[in-house]
């Protein structure tokens, strides 16, 4: 049993208890792929083969692994291995990839039923499987953080695809925070005071090298929000506590932390694909983590 307690300047006073049990298994996967292929390609094939079923509505993520998964899903539909699958794209990139490979699309709206979603996470906290999304990849992705998070959260089940080094405890680096643009500076100062000594706060700019204030060309999303990158230079002890504390700040619209109770992380290592699944247990009142190591 692991107890996350208030041990850092940004932890809350309440404790979160996680109960976990591991059951590792090894068996062959992706037999049609050679050992030289990208680890993320193997992870993408494993995700489609093991989680996508005919008749599903699928949230189509964004990123390198998601591109591989979308392409493979299109091939499976074209060959007849899968049928009646509809994709809900999380970005213009995933919509374009899906259209290229012949996947029927339905665009996201409130109330749409999504059976399963996959997405590239920027990082995942070990054991809790809390994911970080929305770190800067390209300026075209900045406008889709809220949509990506919404689709993953409403899906009945989700998979985050990552590389081995992206899965660990004590994550560092940027946590994107969407804020009201009119009073962004006051919000940034409050966040900076809250994590003084642990993080820097930069307003994301649409061009490079604009400094912490975002210069003359800050990112403004289609909903009128600025994006603050809260860049942690020391390990974050609890992403759950961090998410709760950010949610309490006036003017914070949302952030790139996803706490999903039914999710799996598919970890692409050099020679194997490993999966870790999170499920809630009403009887135990906590979280159980199951692991499987899938040998290439």
Curated annotation (Swiss-Prot):
UniProt pathway: Carbohydrate degradation; pentose phosphate pathway; D-ribose 5-phosphate from D-ribulose 5-phosphate (non-oxidative stage): step 1/1
InterPro entries, A to Z: NagB/RpiA_transferase-like, Ribose-5P_isomerase, Ribose5P_isomerase_type_A
TM annotation in the entry: none
Sorted UniProt keywords: Chloroplast, Isomerase, Plastid, Transit peptide
GO cellular component: chloroplast
GO MF entries: ribose-5-phosphate isomerase activity
Outcome of gene disruption: No visible phenotype under normal growth conditions.
Coarse class of the protein's main subcellular location: plastid
Cellular localization per UniProt: Plastid, Chloroplast
Presequence positions on this chain: 1-30
Record-level GO BP terms: pentose-phosphate shunt, non-oxidative branch
PANTHER family named in the record: RIBOSE-5-PHOSPHATE ISOMERASE 3, CHLOROPLASTIC-RELATED (PTHR43748), RIBOSE-5-PHOSPHATE ISOMERASE 4, CHLOROPLASTIC-RELATED (PTHR43748:SF1)
Family per record: Belongs to the ribose 5-phosphate isomerase family.
Role played: Catalyzes the reversible conversion of ribose-5-phosphate to ribulose 5-phosphate.
Name of the featured protein: Probable ribose-5-phosphate isomerase 4, chloroplastic
Gene (UniProt): RPI4
């Amino acid at each position: 049993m692991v107890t996350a307690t208030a041990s850092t300047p940004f932890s809350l006073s309440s404790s979160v208890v996680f109960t976990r049990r591991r059951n590792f298994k090894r068996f062959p996967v992706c037999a049609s792929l050679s050992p030289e292929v990208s680890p993320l390609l193997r992870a993408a094939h494993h995700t489609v083969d093991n989680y996508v079923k005919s008749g599903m509505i699928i949230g189509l993520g964004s990123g390198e692994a998601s591109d591989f998964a979308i392409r493979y899903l299109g091939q499976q539909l074209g060959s007849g291995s899968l049928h009646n699958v509809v994709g809900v794209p999380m970005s213009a990139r995933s919509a374009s990839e899906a259209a290229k490979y012949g996947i029927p699309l339905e665009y996201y709206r409130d109330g749409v039923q999504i059976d399963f979603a996959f997405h590239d996470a920027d990082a995942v906290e070990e054991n809790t499987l809390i994911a970080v999304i929305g770190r800067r990849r390209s300026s075209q992705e900045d406008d889709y953080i809220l949509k990506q998070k919404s689709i993953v959260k409403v899906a009945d089940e989700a998979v985050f695809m990552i590389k081995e080094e992206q899965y660990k405890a004590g994550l560092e680096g940027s946590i994107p925070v969407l804020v009201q643009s009119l009073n962004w500076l006051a919000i940034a100062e409050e966040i900076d005071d809250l994590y003084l000594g642990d993080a820097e706060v930069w307003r994301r700019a649409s061009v490079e090298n604009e400094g912490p204030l975002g210069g003359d060309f800050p990112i403004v999303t289609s909903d009128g929000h600025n994006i603050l990158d809260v860049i942690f230079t020391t390990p974050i002890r609890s992403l759950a506590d961090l998410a709760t504390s950010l949610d309490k700040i006036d003017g914070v619209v949302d952030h790139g932390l996803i706490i999903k109770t039914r999710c799996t992380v598919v970890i692409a290592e050099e020679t194997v694909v490993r999966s870790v699944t999170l499920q809630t247990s009403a009887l135990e009142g906590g979280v159980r983590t199951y692991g499987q190591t899938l040998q290439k």
